[in-house]
Every structure is written in C-alpha cells, then in structure tokens.
Amino acid sequence: MTAYHFVGIKGTGMSALAQVLHDLGYTVQGSDVEKWFFTQKALEERGIPVLPFSKDNIRPGYTVIAGNAFPDTHEEIEAARQLGVPVIRYHRFLGQLAGKFTSIAVTGSHGKTTTTGLLAHVMQGAHPTSYLIGDGTGKGEPGSKYFVFEACEYRRHFLSYFPDYAIMTNIDFDHPDYFANVDDVFSAFQQMANQVKKAIVACGDDPYLPNIQAKVPILFYGFGEENDFQARNIVKTTEGMAFDVFVRNTFFASFAIPRFGTHNVLNALAVIALCHYEGVDAGTIAKRLQTFQGVKRRFSEKTVGRQVLIDDYAHHPREITATLEAARQKYPGREVVAIFQPHTYTRTQTFLREFAESLLQADHVYLCDIFGSAREHEGKLTIRDLQAQIPRSQLLEEQNVAVLKQHQDAVLVFMGAGDIQKFQQAYERAVLSA
C-alpha cells in the first residue's frame, strides 16, 4: 500500500484530506512552513508527521499530493518527478476519492463550510459517513457509504468532481483575482451542475441559482413559496433559530438549530432537503440539527472577563453582514465591535465600498493591515483606503490590542481569512497579563 506525502499539509483542505486517508488506514505524512496553523491540532492528535519542507522528504513508493498554492518548481514536487514518484494535485485526488462513495459535494460562494459540517453531522446520525470540511476537519469512516465534502469554486477546482449530489448555497462575485464578474462565476457553477449524477439541491431565493440547468432533478429551497422546500414561521431567539419546513406546500416537520442568523436557516434547509431526498427520517434530522456544535472559525466564541470574543472566517461583505447580524441576535443590547483584517489586495480593492457598508453595522470598527495571499504580497492599495471609508474607525496592530479593553461588556468580533487569530491571541494575552 502506498504512503501519501502532502506538500502543504497545513492547508485547510489538505489537512482534512490527510485525516480522511489516515482514518481509512493509509500511511500519511506531510510538510509545510514552520509557522503554527490551527489545522495542526487534528494532525498532531492523530500522530500524522508534519515535517519542514525538504526534498529529502520524498522517497520511492510514495504518492505526493500537492497543495494548489505550490508551483511545480517546489523542491519537493521536483524531487518527486526526478524519482518517478506520482504527483497529484489536491482537487484531482479528492475527485478520485469521492468517486468511491455516494458523494455529496457542497459548494457556493458563502456558507459551504458550515453547510458541509452540518450535513456531515446529520448524515452520521443515519448512516456511516466520511467527510471533508473546509475548516481543516476530516474523518474517514471505514465502511462508510457516504462521503460529504466541501467543493471550492476558486479557479474552477470543483470541476475535478463528478458527485452524485451537489448542494449549491448561492452564487456571488468573489475571488476577483480569478473570476471576471458574477457571470463568470455563474458559468463555473453551470459547468459543475452538468457533472452531477443524481440530483442538485439549490437555494431558490438566490438571484442566479434558479437559472441553473441540469440533466438531473434540481430541488430548490428557501423562504419563497415557489421553493420545493420552504422555511416558514421563523423564530429568532438568543438560543438560535426555530422554523417549520413545508415540502411543496405540505407541512413536513418543525426544526431548531443552535446557530444564529437567517443564513443558518438556509444552510439547515439545504441539509434537510438533501436528507429528505435520501430517505432520512424527520426525527433523526431534527435531533442531529439540535446537537450541531458548528465548525472551526465560524462564529467560534469564548468569554474573556466580561467580554465575548468571536472568531469568524468572514472575508466578504456579505459574510461580514451575516456574522454581525448573528452577533446582535445572540447578544441583544450589547456593544458589537468589529475587528477586521481584509484578505487579499484584489478583493479589498474590488469591494472597498461594500466592505465599508457592511462594517458600519458594528458599533465600532478596528482595521488590521491587509493580508496578502500566497500569490500576492503587496498592492497599491493600503488599509488606510478602507479606513477613509469608515468614519471613526481605527487601525489595530498586535502591539496595541489593549485598546480593545475599553469596550467593557462588548462582543468583539474578529473577522478575516488571513491570520486575524494572532490579534485575538495577542489581546487574550494582554488581558491575562493585566
């Protein structure tokens, strides 16, 4: 049996895939930069070796799975080619693995990680299920029939997948370094729809998804009456969301989720529709929905003194709006403070005005310097361009995080897809050392 070596094992998808293969009985190791990432914990708990990059890591008999951020000129990929060791990109390998199961791909511009996690959690209550979530969490369940996995549209990587089912949460313009406009994004999703084998579950309230065409049935979900699966009688509380589901205008069941914001009702509705199609009973779905603990870096909360600190991956204006809405629902009457680190110069430039508008929904805004991706390290834009759009916003650096102490009893919402966590960690240290 081959051993798998992951080039860039700390990436969220790569880490999750390594966990899946390890659980299924394969020998797995990987390499990456030495900087600590939150994805390491699950690897370390399984005893999966994480090595510094070196061409000496590659040996005959291995199969190399390469992260998409690493070029063919990377020393380990070059070493593999010289040794005749097979090299396969992450998304291509994932496509091959998914083909061995009844596969359910979860995709969409927003909400796919939470929806993948929620679907995996609910399906496990009915059948043995393997899963790969984009928060760095993966599980390979020996003997499982189903494989639930997150499918990213970036660079059309999800076109490597030919799933039995696909959930499509929404279509929005994002990744402006790759997609030209929202029509370009739509065309990618249309291509994906053509590759689905059994059925598609799509949000009918989305402006674009109702225009998707496919050779398989499309089940629409949402709040509108024209949807196959409709949520009605929505109740928001400080404990979460409750709602009734009607299937083609006939009452199906009542559900509750310990998550916040109307976007999470839609995420749950997608899961309910897919499970209904696969014959999972309403009682099992309801029970599992109520025990969902969330996914990493999606509204992850902790209390420090009299403040609540929330860590969230939100890095698009629509996601910021949803996260701040959720914070206000759970903590009504408390000051909501946004601490935001923009992710990539191209995205910040493209959505500068929209970022400002979404952040203005907080009571106070702090901005961290722009985080450039692995593909871009600097741009003409600076964080001050965004600051100029947000009255009374302040710049935040790691060494001056103590300024956040003035917001007593507040909800501090740290948002971003880069290394925003280091600001939260620095603040927690500042509070503890006071």
From Swiss-Prot:
Catalyses: UDP-N-acetyl-alpha-D-muramate + L-alanine + ATP = UDP-N-acetyl-alpha-D-muramoyl-L-alanine + ADP + phosphate + H(+)
From the UniProt record, report the name of the gene that encodes this protein. Answer: murC
Q: Which UniProt keywords apply?
A: ATP-binding, Cell cycle, Cell division, Cell shape, Cell wall biogenesis/degradation, Cytoplasm, Ligase, Nucleotide-binding, Peptidoglycan synthesis
The residues listed in the UniProt record as binding ATP, with positions renumbered to this chain, are 108-114
Q: Name one GO molecular function term.
A: ATP binding
For this entry, the protein name equals: UDP-N-acetylmuramate--L-alanine ligase
Q: Top enzyme class of this protein?
A: ligase
Q: Which pathway does the UniProt entry assign to this protein?
A: Cell wall biogenesis; peptidoglycan biosynthesis
Stored HAMAP family: MurC
What is the documented function of this protein? Cell wall formation.
What Gene3D superfamilies does the database record attribute to this sequence? Mur ligase, C-terminal domain, Mur-like, catalytic domain, NAD(P)-binding Rossmann-like Domain
For this record, an example GO cellular component is: cytoplasm
The EC number(s) given in the record are 6.3.2.8
Q: Which InterPro entries match?
A: Mur-like_cat_sf, Mur_ligase_C, Mur_ligase_C_dom_sf, Mur_ligase_cen, Mur_ligase_N, MurCDEF_pg_biosynth, UDP-N-AcMur_Ala_ligase_MurC
Biological process GO annotation list?
A: cell division; cell wall organization; peptidoglycan biosynthetic process; regulation of cell shape
Lineage, broadest ranks:
Bacteria, Bacillati, Bacillota, Bacilli, Bacillales
User: Which family does the record assign?
Assistant: Belongs to the MurCDEF family.
